[in-house]
Each structure stands twice: as C-alpha cells, then as structure tokens.
Amino acid sequence: MRILITGAAGFIGQQLLADLAVQQPNWTLFAADIREIPANLLRGNVHPLLLDISRRAAVLKAVAECQPQAIVHLASVVSPPPGMSEASLHAIDVDGTQAVVDAAAAHGVEQLIITSSGAAYGYYPENAEWIDEHDPLRGHNKFAYARHKREVEELLVQARITH
C-alpha cells in the first residue's frame, strides 16, 4: 500500500505516521509537509516530502510522482502564526484541500481521507449539546479555521457529486 499523508509534521500527522510505520512496515508512506518531518519518524518505509499544500501544481505533481493508493489529508492551520494573512490561511485550508481532491481524482487514488472538525458547525451557544452531520454547517466568522472547515465540507459535497 502506498499512502500520502499531508500535514505529516503536525500533531495528528506525527501520531499517524509513527503508528503506520510500525504497524504496516511493508507500506510505503509519503510524509508530506511544508515543515521538516522529525528524524525519529523517518523509518525505512517513510519518505519525507517537502510540500506546500497551497501550491496547486506542487500538489498535483506530488500525487503524480508518489502514485498513492490512499491519501490522508491532514494539512490545515488551526492556530496561525502572527501576521499570517487570511488569504494565506484560505490557500492552505480550502484551496489546498481542493487541490488534493482534484489530484486524487486525476490520478485514480482509491481512498481519500480528509479530516474535519466540529468547528465546521461553528461554536454557538444555541448549538445542541451533541451535533452530527445532519446539523447545519455554520462555521464562525471570527474564527478562520471554523469558516474554512465549513467551506471544506461544502467542497467535499461537490466533489462527491463530481467524482
């Protein structure tokens, strides 16, 4: 199995990479991130890949070259560094996800896993205590991550129709 993991240097990405590298030693894992992958995660079946998810052409090229059977898309910005623009955040969170979806479709990727968040539903006091996929996606205007997760959910609905 060949797996491309975006956001592999992030918290969830590191955990997933560490577990898969040990539990599935015969799998080829492409650890993609704009940041360096920690050395302790670079086992024999892990191949680091410097990838800026906001660069559509780079995403398409990475998927074409890696030829993954599955993609686990974790790349996102939860807590942006000071000074990061809204446009940069959107380019990573939303446009980057669209690029991954399009690359997966273009190159026949069998499985595409994209993480979501309760943030897509927005943080509102009137929300039910328990929410599920039938509740409205509202994001939150004051929290870019929540807005972007809502947008990603919407683009995934379109992707399911298109692909």
Mark where each language-model region is.
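Active-site Tyr-X1-5-Lys
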Residues: 141-163
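Rossmann-fold cofactor-recognition segment
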Residues: 43-55
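SDR active-site strand-loop-helix element
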Residues: 6, 32, 71-75, 112-118
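Residues forming the Rossmann-fold NAD(P)(H) cofactor-binding site
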Residues: 11-14, 94, 150
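N-terminal Rossmann NAD(P)H-binding glycine-rich loop of SDR-like oxidoreductase domains
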Residues: 1-25
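Conserved Rossmann-fold NAD(P)-dependent oxidoreductase catalytic core, especially the SDR/UDP-sugar
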Residues: 98-145
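Conserved glycine-rich Rossmann-like NAD(P)H-binding loop of the short-chain dehydrogenase/reductase
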Residues: 25-36
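NAD(P)H-binding glycine-rich loop region in Rossmannoid oxidoreductase-like domains
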Residues: 53-95, 103-106, 123
